[in-house]
Amino acid sequence: MVGTALLLLALLPGTSSKHGTPRAPLLPGAPGPWLRRPLFSLELSDAEDAFPRRAGPLEVPADSHVFVQAALARPSPRWGLALHRCSVTPSSRPTLGPALVLLRGGCPADDSVSFSPPPRPDAASVSRFSFRLRPVFNASVQFLHCQISRCRRRSSHHRRAVRLTPVPLTPPAPLRCLPQDEACAGSSLSLGTDSPHLHMLTQPIVVTIPRPSPRPSKSLPGRSVHPEPPAPAPAALEPAPVVALVLAAFVLGAALAAGLGLVCAHSAPPPPGPPPRASLSGPQLQRPPVGRDGTTQ
């Protein structure tokens, strides 16, 4: 039983049958605490010199230009940045579905891709390019995927140090930084897709559809169509003129009613009354004579 236990302890990784024997150090190329910190940054913008941009996904209309900036999270005099492959897909995973390839091997794979000069001549840790977001995918949210790695800057001091230092048993070292024209000429070696130095960064893009402009009116050829000026907005009325207009309308209505009353009073026929009496100066009726016995004669 004791022998079996000792054999199991000897086979366990990280343990030794002899006490006091130090553990083997990790290889320099093995993953360590430095991988927890971000090494690169990928930013998008709708203008060439609008870096850094506000937080949040980029929102651009379809068939417009998108500007990309890839940079090292911490600039270093020894390390530079190299772009290997960039593509646009409708999925957040770069390996699923169709893709619009923009860069392949660090060189433009689309006609609309153009590299911009770095913000400073000595800024080897920043790489900028732009492309036209063609309406290839029917998706409102698309994703830009870029494979980025670090590269060694050219330095004579660094080359002498490499020659004097023995080569350890580590993964392949990063490539040397080369200018864009020299890298696309085929003079540089490309990293494999499973290289530990490659890092994939993804940024979302919100694609909007612009509204169509109104069609111009038909006109005779050779005549320029001038746009109609916009109608002036009605001015707000002040309260004083409104009150004056109301009072004037009231007075005018009262005067009109009074005038109509006078006209009706003078043009109406007189009311019927008793028959007129006979005048004293006119002929009077004579009574018949009365006799003594009270009879008329």
UniProtKB/Swiss-Prot annotation:
It holds the Pfam family Zona_pellucida. It is a single-pass membrane protein. Residues 268-277 have a biased composition (Pro residues). Residues 1-17 form the signal peptide. Coiled coil: none annotated. Disruption phenotype: Females show no effects on puberty onset, estrous cyclicity and body weight. They have increased litter sizes relative to wild-type with normal litter frequency. Females ovulate more eggs in natural cycles with increased uterine implantation sites. They have increased numbers of antral follicles and corpora lutea. Double knockout females for TGFBR3L and gonadotrope-specific TGFBR3 are infertile. They have increased serum follicle-stimulating hormone (FSH), pituitary protein content relative to controls. They have larger ovaries with increased numbers of antral follicles and corpora lutea. InterPro entries: ZP-C, ZP-C_dom. Residues 208-233, 267-297 are annotated as: Disordered. This is Transforming growth factor-beta receptor type 3-like protein. It comes from Mus musculus (Mouse).
